[in-house]
Amino acid sequence: MQKILVEFYDKENLENVFSLLSMTYDKVLFITFSDDKSNEAFENDEPLKRFIKRRAPHLEIGTVNVTEKKFTDIIDALSRAVNEKDAYDFDLTGGSEIVIAAIGHVVATSDNPNLSIHQYDIKTGSTVFRHPEYEILKREQSAPKLSVPEIISLHGGKAAAERNELYPNVIKLREGILKLFNAVKNCSKEWNTFCSIPFTEALNKDKMVITKSVENGNYMNVCRKIGDELEKAELITDIEIYKKNGRFYYEYTLNCKKEERFLYEKSGNILEYYTYLAATECGAYTDVCVSVEVDIDGLITQDNTDTTNEIDVMASSGHVPFCISCKNKAAINEHLYEILAVSKNYCGKYAIPVVVSNANNLPAIEKRAKAMGIVLIDNISDLTYEDFKRKLKCLI
């Protein structure tokens, strides 16, 4: 006797696979409809089929197509699909009222005694209902666990590159990340400018000497301010300001590990890695990745026309994805729309978009973010590292 899952195909792929991730089956039957073209959508849903084959390589995948989403048509299709020798488990999750009613009719009138139904709350990962037990079960702690690349692939994308693949021992850079963030956290505006100033670099006895052209008077002030903070933190040494060929230069020696050099290249890198480190160490997430470059068609090429987006920090707690955008300034409307679009496109409707900013957000932005379902964490320069970890942990 085979155990067969009957699943109504949905455009949200997490709903399509949640039962398969939670229980063991021999076969899955996806119910599709011609009138809403879900039959065509299923036929073209290669990300779903690839995901299922990776997670359950021996599972047989079948379909039952219904011409119209009518009560009698659904009953007829289900009745034809159900035989008397196998066990069938119907998933009600996300189903419309007419679908749920049709399943109830089939289960109640079928001669097959091995029919069951269940429903999940995808957000919490809990079992809401199961028949024939007729009981509401408490939240299960064994909700499915998905990695960040799995979540992206399930929704048709692919992680093109992850910075922590280039620097796999990010935890070994912990001290350097914390020291740099604490040095510049209260002068994020100047840090943004400092990192944008053109520079040259040279190697001197295994130390990197950086020279910035500071003809612009503001550049000189910025370099002095940031340089003082970095010098106090013992992150740079040998500061020298000099004039050559009528131009002023600000020169210093980086006092950091070679592997930490990238933290000084772009102003946003340090906030991203500080957030990544905190999310990793708070102990609440199944998987955490940083600087995740995502290709929506799932085909990574070297073609310059290949469209990709970057998610600063992405995490998963069980099956729930968190997409985190890191900003060295207050959040604005554009940031909200960006993270919402990226999270929905690459991680589905259950994704939780988050904006971490190192400034005080305006009340209007906070109100707008709440209406859009976006979580804001601002003024992180005022938080201790432990407080920041608690904030990230409370997202779950």
Residue ranges and their predicted role:
Residues 1-87, 101-309, 319-320, 337, ...:
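Long, low-complexity, Lys/Arg-enriched
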Residues 11-12, 94-96, 329:
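Short glycine-rich anion-binding loops that position phosphate/pyrophosphate groups of nucleotides
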Residues 87-93:
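Short glycine-rich phosphate-binding loop at a beta-alpha junction
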Residues 92, 98-101:
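C-terminal structured interaction module
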Residues 93, 312-314, 327:
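Anionic group-transfer/hydrolysis microenvironments
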Residues 314-323:
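Active-site beta-strand-loop-beta-strand hairpin of nuclease catalytic cores
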Residues 326-335:
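Short beta-strand-loop-alpha-helix junction that forms the active-site gateway
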